[in-house]
């Protein structure tokens, strides 16, 4: 008869192995396409490929490169390329291609072109009965791959290995390898990243570029009205009570650039993830500085193209320096005690006019304490002696100017009591 403790141990071992198996995901090769900084300080774009076999991985990486080149040639992404990293996860499918069940009402010439492929993310056309709506059905597999390989993703492109036109927004900006693939990708990114609506009629909801408010004074893109052809344009029927800001935007047609409203929303989406300041020094925001010491402050902002970043330094809310990433502070120029050093960084891009949340502004504040570190050495010659007494006496009787670190009893006054304390220090009392 088998010992019950052995059975219990085996059951525990089996459960442990099963748990480890469930928690251990599959790791795939990840190619760095474009790296501009640490993943925790950039918008991280991750590409997933569906319908690429292992033998087609080189084609997949080439396809990713073409899309990335096109994306960062488009305004405003071209202006903010320094704010992004791009990675491509190499996930092979068993078969090349995707699914087209031929079930959509608008398949047209592709109605009889029915095919299926065994792909990793099970992408398919004809979703919701719309031929061009190309989606990955196995989204849980996509999330697993992202978590196991690039857990700090912000944007996901899912590129499907077929030349038939199609794509979709949502959590994953999905598109095919059609001749218009880059345009499709950038358009779908408008949905999945910037939360933009289509500017052709699909359905209505309030977004940065879609509204039911036709009053110019109340309209959300009021700061742009009548510039760059921005207006309040009615959607076609049945969306006659909804309005878009432009008649020829990338969110309506492939080919044109983003309108001013959509470009602005894209930039604000970047800054909803990132801080303008990449890093700063000192990293410790609570500082103690000797009264005759020098403290160095610096920041590393993420610059856009062309650069529209401004930098302003303040000490105790008083302007000190503009335009520099560095500040050298001589503590002797300030009183003993608490001081605030602040740097304010702003992006004054003319592509943004409406920023009520101040997303295009960032600051760092250091709390600095200036204190004496050599009690009694008033002339800072490294010794406490009669010369310091003479200096203090002259100050008390009004012959010389104020002396730093002379308030030896910290009562807020420099007087005979401080002279007595200084003499006692010299005498060793």
Regions found by a protein language model. Name each.
Residues 26-145, 351:
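Propeptide-to-catalytic entry region of secreted or membrane-anchored zinc metalloproteases
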Residues 182-199:
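Active-site recognition of the HExxH zinc-binding catalytic motif
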Residues 371-429:
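Cellulosome-associated attachment modules in secreted, modular CAZymes
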């Amino acid at each position: 008869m088998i010992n019950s403790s052995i059975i219990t141990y085996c059951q525990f071992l089996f459960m442990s192995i099963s748990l480890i198996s469930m928690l251990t995901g599959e790791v795939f090769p990840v190619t760095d396409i474009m790296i501009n900084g640490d993943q925790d300080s950039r918008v991280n774009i991750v590409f997933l490929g569906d319908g690429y076999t292992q033998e087609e991985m080189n084609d997949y990486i080439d396809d990713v490169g073409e899309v990335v080149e096109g994306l960062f040639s488009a305004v405003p992404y071209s202006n903010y390329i320094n704010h992004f990293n791009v990675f491509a996860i190499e996930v092979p499918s068993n078969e090349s291609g995707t699914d087209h069940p031929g079930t959509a009402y608008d398949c047209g010439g592709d109605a009889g072109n029915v095919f299926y492929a065994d792909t990793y993310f099970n992408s398919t056309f004809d979703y919701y009965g719309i031929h061009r709506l190309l989606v990955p059905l196995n989204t849980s597999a996509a999330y697993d791959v992202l978590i196991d390989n690039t857990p700090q993703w912000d944007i996901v492109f899912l590129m499907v290995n077929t030349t038939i036109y199609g794509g979709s927004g949502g959590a994953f900006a999905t598109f095919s390898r059609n001749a218009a693939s880059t345009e499709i990708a950038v358009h779908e990114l408008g949905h999945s990243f910037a939360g933009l609506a289509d500017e052709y009629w699909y359905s209505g909801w309030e977004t940065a570029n879609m509204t039911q408010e036709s009053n110019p004074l109340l309209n959300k893109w009021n700061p742009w009205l009548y510039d760059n052809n921005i207006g309040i344009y009615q959607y076609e029927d049945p969306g006659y009570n909804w309005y878009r800001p432009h008649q020829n935007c990338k969110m309506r047609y492939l080919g044109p650039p983003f309108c001013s409203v959509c470009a602005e929303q894209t930039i604000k989406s970047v800054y909803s993830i990132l801080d303008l300041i990449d890093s700063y020094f000192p990293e410790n925001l609570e500082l103690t500085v000797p009264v005759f010491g020098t403290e160095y402050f610096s920041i590393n902002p993420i610059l856009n193209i062309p650069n529209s970043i401004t930098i302003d330094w303040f000490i105790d809310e008083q302007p000190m320096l503009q335009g520099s990433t560095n500040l050298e502070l001589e503590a002797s120029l300030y009183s003993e005690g608490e001081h605030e050093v602040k740097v304010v960084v702003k992006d004054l891009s003319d592509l943004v006019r409406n920023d009520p949340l101040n997303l295009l502004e960032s600051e760092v504040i250091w709390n600095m304490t200036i204190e004496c570190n050599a009690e009694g050495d008033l002339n800072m010659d490294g010794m406490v002696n009669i010369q310091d007494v003479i200096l203090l006496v002259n100050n008390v009787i009004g012959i010389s100017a104020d002396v730093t670190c002379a308030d030896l009893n910290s009562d807020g006054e420099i007087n005979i009591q401080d002279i007595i304390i200084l003499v006692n220090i010299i005498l060793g009392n």
